[in-house]
Design a protein with these regions (language model features):
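Absolute protein N-terminus
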Residues: 1-2, 70
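Conserved positions in beta-strands of structured domains
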Residues: 4, 15, 40-42
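A structural micro-motif recognizing beta-strand termini
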Residues: 17-19, 30
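Short alpha-helix capping/helix-loop boundary micro-motifs
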Residues: 23-27
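C-terminal structural segments of small proteins and small subunits
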Residues: 42-70
């Protein structure tokens, strides 16, 4: 399941980040988005979702959210 498919308000554990883009992978790691970390989708809109990672909220577009496997 990818982050786009997550139910709002339910905590999930990140299993993997599937991207060939080294810069995107490094960026997500700096945000605390890596395997084993907890993530909760707070809200969703047409362009993506707002996710809580390490007690911080981030607006994540749909393309990036589809690379986050939960």
């Amino acid at each position: 399941m990818v982050l786009n498919d997550a139910v709002i308000g339910v905590p999930y554990t990140i299993r993997d980040i599937q991207t060939d883009d080294v810069e995107l992978d490094a960026f997500l790691r700096r945000l605390g988005c890596y395997s084993g970390q907890s993530v909760v989708v707070v809200s969703r809109n047409r362009k993506g979702c707002v996710a809580s990672i390490l007690n911080n909220r981030y607006s994540i577009d749909a393309d990036i959210a589809s690379a986050i496997i939960i």
